[in-house]
């Protein structure tokens, strides 16, 4: 998987700075105007109160109200802010490939953020729980004692125990004007000294990410930096805390010639151009969404901030009055014309059989395929080779709908090898597989649809064989261990959906003789369920529904032979 690579974070940052320089503008004077307005107009006794709230181990709806009220006061005092501007990007704003790339990355970002906010890392609770999870947790804490450590940790478990977790959205994150005002007023220093100190941090940021060792050296020259906390930043406790990242961001706003990402201003007129430029840099630098829970890499951070609001200051403006998340406020319209693609014949000379269905059978298949929503995540997987597939599965996790069909192989020797080492299907079980069904299904996939796969090469070859070059395949690139993480549970819960994998699977001999190799057969449908389970962190929780009737999958067998 891509996230196994070492991420060259600062190189990515420099590349993004260079390519997006035309969208940056000098902001020092505007930031200082807002900082002075906050320093003069904000009640800092309320700031101190909210800072105490953020240090509490358990925070309630009342505490959240205090934070939201103070954020509203700050927003009212500022000129630099992001506006609620929901954007739908369509063909014309970006080309087809860019739209699909953006849609895929926003979906991955959504899943990453969700996993991060639910992962207790380093003893610090990192986010929101559902109401049912809150209830279970409350009962658990009552029975076990709140202060008892639940995980090995030297940190403090910080909990937002609120009825509506969506009220937490966009209430955190640092704002340079606020950081400067708080350092000035609460640090008892002059704003001029604070600006000089933060400028030094900003200059250092042009060549590296400043760390705590750098901070210690600079604090010897700028006493006002002593206020910066040495604690590691965590999700949902920032905003009014004096973190190093907040100070660095503030320092970046003072560098007019540094092409800093922090000084980007987004407008409805330049939004799609900025996104297009970002996707271009991503492609050249091989950037990606690292789906492991944790801090965002530079590309993820920029994409999240840009897509949160289509108008304003993505990094440094007040965002507390913006509702929704990035993947909600910026959406991609991939289904302007969800017309079905042509039923293209296979190319001559390849080992894919073409057989015709009856009109009634075609009508049933068309009815089933009409229930495939082109805007939903759609997994695709096959067993067999791309030019001689024996099983095809499509699965949409949002609805639980799936398509599963079979095909008699042309290459029996290759099939038996695949059966022994992979799918465990038996030739006798596929003798009566409905001819032409697999090809007809591929031909009915909606035009320009985005498909999700674990390993895309064979899928792309299969689609190309059927003349479906319009279809986009997104490869999640899970490691082999990750992909099979839910294998046992998925087979236990859903094995009854696929009864054609009855052979014995023997792992291929390898030099390292890995004892962990699975002997479970590979089923196209169950593999799709496993891959989605890895992303969700649990097996499917909804009822699965086959869109094709069982009677259509195989030809009728005679009751007796003459």
From Swiss-Prot:
Gene Ontology cellular-component annotations: helical viral capsid; host cell cytoplasm; ribonucleoprotein complex; viral nucleocapsid
Region (Binding site for the cap structure m7GTP): 54-237
Enzyme class, broadest EC rank: hydrolase
Superkingdom in the source lineage: Viruses
Site note Important for exonuclease activity, residues: 458
Residues involved in Mn(2+) binding: 381, 383, 527
Subcellular compartments: Virion; Host cytoplasm
InterPro entries found in the cross-reference section: Nucleocapsid_arenaviridae, Nucleocapsid_C_arenaviridae, Nucleocapsid_C_sf, Nucleocapsid_N_arenaviridae
Annotated positions binding Zn(2+): 391, 498, 501, 523
EC numbers, comma separated: 3.1.13.-
Keywords: Capsid protein, Helical capsid protein, Host cytoplasm, Host-virus interaction, Hydrolase, Inhibition of host IKBKE by virus, Inhibition of host innate immune response by virus, Inhibition of host RLR pathway by virus, Interferon antiviral system evasion, Manganese, Metal-binding, Ribonucleoprotein, RNA-binding, Viral immunoevasion, Viral nucleoprotein, Virion, Zinc
GO molecular function: hydrolase activity; metal ion binding; RNA binding
Any one GO BP annotation for this protein: negative stranded viral RNA replication
Keyword RNA-binding part of the UniProt annotation: yes
Subunit structure: Homomultimerizes to form the nucleocapsid. Binds to viral genomic RNA. Interacts with glycoprotein G2. Interacts with protein Z; this interaction probably directs the encapsidated genome to budding sites. Interacts with protein L; this interaction does not interfere with Z-L interaction. Interacts with host IKBKE (via Protein kinase domain); the interaction inhibits IKBKE kinase activity.
Family per similarity comment: Belongs to the arenaviridae nucleocapsid protein family.
Recorded domain comment: The N-terminal region is important for the cap-binding activity while the C-terminal region contains the 3'-5' exoribonuclease activity. A CCHE zinc binding site is present in the C-terminal region and may thus contribute to the substrate binding and/or the specificity of the exonuclease activity.
Known role: Encapsidates the genome, protecting it from nucleases. The encapsidated genomic RNA is termed the nucleocapsid (NC). Serves as template for viral transcription and replication. The increased presence of protein N in host cell does not seem to trigger the switch from transcription to replication as observed in other negative strain RNA viruses.
Protein name listed in UniProt: Nucleoprotein
Primary gene name: N
């Amino acid at each position: 998987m891509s996230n196994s690579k070492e991420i060259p974070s600062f190189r990515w940052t420099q590349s993004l700075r260079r390519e997006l320089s035309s969208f940056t503008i000098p902001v020092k004077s505007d930031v200082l105007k807002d900082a002075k307005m906050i320093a003069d107009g904000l009640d800092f006794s309320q700031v101190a109160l909210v800072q105490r709230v953020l240090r509490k181990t358990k925070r309630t709806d009342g505490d959240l109200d205090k934070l939201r009220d103070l954020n509203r006061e700050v927003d009212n005092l500022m000129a630099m802010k992001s506006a609620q501007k929901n954007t739908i990007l369509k063909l014309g704003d970006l080309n087809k490939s860019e739209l699909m790339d953006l849609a895929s990355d926003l979906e991955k970002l959504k899943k990453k953020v969700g996993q991060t906010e639910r992962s207790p890392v380093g003893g610090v609770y990192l986010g929101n729980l559902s109401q049912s999870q809150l209830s279970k947790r409350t009962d658990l804490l009552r029975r076990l004692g709140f202060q008892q450590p639940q995980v090995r940790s030297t940190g403090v478990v910080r909990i937002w125990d609120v009825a509506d977790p969506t009220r937490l959205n966009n209430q955190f994150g640092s704002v340079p004007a606020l950081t400067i005002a708080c350092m000035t007023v609460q640090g008892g220093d002059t704003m001029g000294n604070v600006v000089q100190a933060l400028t030094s941090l900003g200059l250092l940021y042009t060549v590296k990410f400043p760390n705590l060792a750098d901070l210690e050296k600079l604090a010897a020259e700028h006493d006002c930096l002593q206020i910066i906390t040495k604690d590691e930043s965590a999700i949902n406790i920032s905003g009014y805390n004096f973190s190093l990242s907040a100070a660095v961001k503030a320092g970046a706003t003072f560098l007019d010639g540094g092409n800093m990402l922090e000084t980007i201003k987004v407008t409805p007129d330049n939004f799609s151009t900025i996104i297009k430029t970002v996707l271009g840099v991503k492609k050249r630098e091989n950037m990606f969404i690292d789906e492991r829970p944790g801090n965002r890499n530079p590309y993820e951070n920029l994409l999240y901030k840009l897509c949160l609001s289509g108008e304003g200051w993505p990094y440094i403006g007040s965002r507390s009055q913006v509702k929704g998340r990035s993947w909600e406020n910026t959406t991609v319209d991939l289904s302007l014309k969800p017309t079905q693609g042509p039923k293209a014949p296979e190319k001559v000379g390849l080992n894919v059989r073409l057989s015709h269905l009856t009109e009634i059978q075609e009508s049933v298949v068309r009815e089933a395929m009409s229930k495939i929503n082109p805007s939903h995540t759609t997994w695709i997987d096959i067993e067999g080779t791309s030019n001689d597939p024996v099983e095809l599965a499509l699965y949409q996790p949002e609805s639980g709908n799936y398509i599963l069909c079979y095909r008699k192989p042309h290459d029996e020797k290759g099939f038996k090898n695949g059966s022994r080492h992979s799918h465990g299907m038996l030739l006798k079980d596929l003798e009566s597989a409905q001819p032409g069904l697999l090809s007809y299904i591929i031909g009915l996939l909606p035009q320009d649809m985005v498909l999700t796969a674990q390993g895309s090469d064979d899928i792309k070859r299969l689609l190309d064989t059927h003349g479906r070059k319009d279809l986009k395949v997104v490869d999640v690139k899970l490691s082999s261990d990750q992909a099979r993480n839910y294998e046992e549970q998925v087979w236990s819960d859903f094995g009854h959906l696929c009864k054609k994998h009855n052979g014995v699977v023997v792992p291929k001999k390898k030099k390292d003789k890995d004892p962990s190799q699975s002997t479970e057969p590979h089923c196209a449908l169950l593999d799709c369920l496993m891959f989605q389970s890895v992303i969700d962190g649990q097996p499917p929780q909804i009822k699965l529904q086959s869109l094709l009737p069982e009677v259509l999958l195989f030809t009728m067998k005679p009751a007796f032979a003459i």
